[in-house]
Amino acid sequence: MKIRNSLKSLKGRHRDNRVIRRRGRTYIINKTVRRFKARQG
């Protein structure tokens, strides 16, 4: 999982990317290509 300051550019890298908010953190998850996972930090 990558940890990035800004997730806006990562969101557009694949059409299946989803922005999810869990426990106050913002994540990008992708069910089909799992290497696109990221967390804002």
Swiss-Prot record:
The keyword Ribosomal protein applies. One of its GO terms (molecular function) is structural constituent of ribosome. This is Large ribosomal subunit protein bL36. GO terms for biological process: translation. GO terms for cellular component: ribonucleoprotein complex; ribosome. The lineage of its organism: Bacteria, Pseudomonadati, Pseudomonadota, Alphaproteobacteria, Sphingomonadales. Belongs to the bacterial ribosomal protein bL36 family. Keywords: Ribonucleoprotein, Ribosomal protein. It comes from the Bacteria. InterPro entries: Ribosomal_bL36, Ribosomal_bL36_sp, Ribosomal_L36_bact.
